[in-house]
Every structure is written in C-alpha cells, then in structure tokens.
A protein has these predicted regions:
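Short, ordered loop/turn segments at secondary-structure junctions
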Residues: 50, 113-115, 137-138, 167-169
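Intrinsically disordered, low-complexity terminal tails and inter-domain linkers enriched
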Residues: 2-15
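Short glycine-/small-residue-rich Rossmann-like dinucleotide-binding loops
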Residues: 89-90, 113, 219-221
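N-terminal Rossmann-like NAD(P) cofactor-binding module of classical short-chain dehydrogenase/reductase
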Residues: 85-86
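C-terminal substrate-binding/catalytic lobe of Rossmann-fold NAD(P)-dependent oxidoreductases
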Residues: 18-22, 27-79, 158-279
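Rossmann-fold NAD(P)-binding glycine/threonine-rich loop
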Residues: 92-104, 111-134, 143-152
Length: 279
C-alpha cells in the first residue's frame, strides 16, 4: 500500500525537526541520540524509555556519550512534543510505539526486527492513518544488496543454489535476522519462490540432500559482530557471492535519521528505504 510518488528530500528538513527516539538508552537508541544531536536539521526532543528504566531522568546526550542536549530520558511523550518517532527496540516496544504514534498522528520509522505476522498487520492498520517506514535494515549498502540479490536470482535461475548466511553479535535475540529474511523475500519476489515452501533454515541429519530451488538460511551468533550478510549462488564449477558488512551501527542510525526527515509531511501509508533512496 505504498503510495506512488517521486522520492525527494522533504522540504521540512529546511527547519528544525523535533524527533522522538523510542528506546533511547538502548544500543541503537544511544547512537541515534548521539548522531541526531550532531545533525543541524534535527533536535532530539523526546528520549523515551520503559517505565522503571534506571536511567530515566538523566540527560539523553550524556547517556549516549556526548554533551548534554537538555532532553531527559522519560517514559512519557507529551502531545505535540515531537514531529516524528524512530523505534529501535523489541517487538513489544514497537507495538507500544505504533499505538502511541497512531494516537498522536506522528510519522513513525521502525527499525525493530523480530516482528511477527501480527505485528506487520498492526503496522498495515496504523499506516491507514499515519506514514510508517519499516525496514529490516536502514543502511544504503544493504538496500542496494536487496536489489542485486533479486536481479541475480532471477537471471541465474535454479541451476544455481542459493544460500544466505547472516552473522551477528552474541546478544542478538532473533534469528534469522530481519535483513536476512528481507534478502530471502527479495529473491522470492523476483523468482516466484515461496518463503513458506522454499526457505530451509539450517540443515541437520544423516540424509538431507539439497532440493532444487530451495533457499538455505543460516544464522551465526558470535562475539561483537555488528552485522554481516552473504548470499551465494553456487553451480557446478563456480560460485557468485554478494556480501555486505556493517562495521558500526552508525550506518543504521544515519539511515534511520535520514528516513525520519524524509517521512515528515508524507501522506499515510507504508514506506520502505527504497522510497527514501529512490530505488
């Protein structure tokens, strides 16, 4: 239900955008606050956290490792305090953000992963009244990778076996990653394959030969890996691999901040990073 319009940088970026960060004390939230505070087009006006979070009441900038920004971590969002929200939390936190933004008619950027079918239905329903941009990965490189993976899969066909391997830090809770699933979905959309019928998660057993046309999916959890995604196309005698490596979470944060500025003033609907980047 993405509205069709030519992507362009929103004119509202010429004035200061008041931004709310949901999960501001989290790993991604801190980078959003830190980088957002450096952006001359933005003001981090609201830094949300769950009730009872020990850091509530402290300056969000200081918590994020930068200078004070005169915005305190809070569990409440006053009406009119922000013009858009970015959510990088967990599914339950994302649901709360969707309901809050719907009630206050705020544009919402969602970077939370691990969302269920019910969560996506909630997003679809909310997008009838507010603009929502949801993406498994906000980085420019990954969004180009999605397009490349789809093109290669379509051109090479089932003579080439597709395997997707994603690697993340040991603390990541959901598997496979939202980005890996997005890559698989891009391949399915381009080839007519089915996420339900053709996607195989790992392999275990004494006799499990690979089936023609299936898409293998594998998850690695180790150390402090920010994010690595590889899709390989293997045939007899050759293999083609496309890999994206994120060495810092800042690529996701910068993409989300860019998306939030772009989303201001857009009509209700569901958007993606493709709309922001004009892909």
């Amino acid at each position: 239900m993405t509205p069709s319009e030519t992507p362009s940088e929103n004119s509202s970026t010429n004035s200061l955008v008041l931004l709310a960060i949901n999960g501001a004390a989290g790993r991604m939230g801190r980078r959003l606050v830190a980088l957002g505070s450096e952006d001359p087009q933005l003001r981090i006006a609201v830094a949300l956290e769950v009730p009872g979070q020990p850091l509530i009441g402290q300056d969000a900038g200081v918590v994020s490792g930068v200078s004070a920004i005169n915005t305190l971590l809070s569990a409440e969002l006053a009406a009119g305090a922000a013009q858009a929200m970015i959510d990088f939390t967990v599914p339950v936190g994302c649901r709360a953000a969707i309901k809050l933004c719907t009630a206050q008619k705020l544009p919402l950027v969602i970077g939370t992963t691990g969302l269920t079918t019910d969560d996506h239905q909630l997003i679809d329903e909310a997008a009838k009244t507010i603009p929502i941009l949801q993406a498994a990965n906000m980085s420019l490189g990954v969004n180009f990778l999605l397009g490349l993976a789809a093109q290669v899969a379509q051109k090479l066909g089932d003579d080439y076996d597709i395997e997707i391997v994603e690697s993340h830090h040991r603390m990541k809770a959901d598997a496979p990653s939202g980005t890996a699933l997005a890559i698989a979905q891009a391949v399915c959309d381009a080839t007519g394959k089915s996420m339900k019928e053709d996607l195989v998660h790992g392999r275990l057993g004494a006799h499990i030969p690979r089936q023609r046309g299936e898409i293998g999916m594998h998850a690695v959890r180790s150390g402090d890996i920010v994010g690595k995604h590889t899709i390989s196309f293997g045939a007899i005698g050759e293999e083609l691999s496309l890999t994206h490596v994120a060495s810092t979470r800042d690529v996701f944060a910068r993409g989300a901040l860019r998306a939030a500025k772009w989303l201001i003033g857009k009509p209700a609907g569901r958007y993606s990073m493709k709309d922001v980047l004009g892909l």
